[in-house]
Amino acid sequence: QRALTRYYLDAGAGGLAVGVHTTQFAIREAGLFAPVLELAMRSATDWARERPIMIAGLAGRTAQTVQEAQIARDLGYHAGLLSLAALKGAHEDELIAHAQAVAREIPLVGFYLQPAVGGLLLPVPFWRRFAEIENVIAIKIAPFNRYRTLDVVRGVVEAGAADRITLYTGNDDHIVLDLLTPFPAGANGGKTVVRIKGGLLGHWSVWVKRAVELLERIHASVASGAIPANLLALDAQVTDCNAAIFDVANDFHGVIAGCHEILRRQGLLAGTWCLDPQETLGPGQKEEIDRVCAAYPHLNDDAFVRANLERWLS
C-alpha cells in the first residue's frame, strides 16, 4: 500500500480513493478498514510535496457507513465515496435519508455503481434530491451506460448544483469521451454546458503516469476548443485495454485481479491475490492483458515504474 501510494503521487495523481475497487471492499470483513486508511493517509502525508485529495470508500447500511465516515474524517480524509450497494431494494426516501446521515459526518462523493457489479438503478429524481444535499461535493458517474450517465447530469442541473458539485467519470468503458463531452445544462438549446472534470476510476489504478498525461491533454483540448481525431481514437484504445483489465468477457469476474496483474508485472505487487479467494483472473484474461499490452505500448508507464520502483519499495 505504501509503495502504491508513492507511485500514484509521483505519477501526478491529484488524489487517492482508498477502500474501493483494488483496495477491496473485503477489507471490512477482515478488520482492515481503519488500518488500510490510516496507512494510506500516513504514506501520502509523508511522501507528497502537496497534500493530495484523500477520499475514503464508504459502504454498508447506515450505522456501518456512518461509523466508517467518522473513522475517515478523524484520519483526515477530505470526503467519503458513498456506495449504496448494501441498500438494494430500499425506497428512494430511505436512500436519501441514508445519504443525509452520512453527509452530517463528512463531505460526500456520490457513486453511481453499475448494476452488473452490485449497483442500484438510480433515476433522475434520486440524483436531483441527492444533489440538493448541501455537503455533497462531487459525484462519481459509473453506471457504464450512456442514458444513466445523462440521468446524473440532469439531476445535478435540475437541483441547481452544477457549480457546487464536481462530476467525475467512473465509466471505465468511456473515459476519454466522458471527459471531452459538453453535456447539456438545461433547455436553452444546449448553449450552457456541464462537463465531467476528472476521473475516479479503477482503470486509473494502473498506468497512472499515462492517465495523468491523458487528462492534461484532454483539458488542454477542451480549453482550446479543438478536439483532434487522434485524441478521439484514444477512447476506443483505452476501452479495449479496460475490457482486458476488467475481464469484461467473463462479466467482470477478474475486475480486481486484472488491475493487480498489471501492478504485479510492473513489480509493484508480489502477486494478484485478493482477500476473497474467489477473486481471481478470469479464463483467458491473462492472454487478453498480453494482447492489449502489445497493441498499445504508448498507454503503459512501465519505463516510469522501472526507473522509480526501488525507491517506492524502500
What would you call each of these model-derived segments?
Residues 13, 77, 135, 161, ...:
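Residue-level recognition of short, well-ordered coil/turn positions
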Residues 242-314:
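C-terminal extensions of enzymes
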Residues 1-127, 278, 302-313:
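Active-site beta->alpha loop and helix N-cap motifs at the rims of alpha/beta catalytic domains
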Residues 44-47, 158-165, 222, 270, ...:
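Structural alpha-beta junctions
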Residues 101-104, 114-255:
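Catalytic alpha/beta core domains of metabolic enzymes, predominantly
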Residues 3-7, 35, 39, 230-244, ...:
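A non-catalytic, amphipathic alpha-helix used as a structural packing/dimerization or gating element
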Residues 42, 213, 260-264:
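Generic alpha-helical structural context detector
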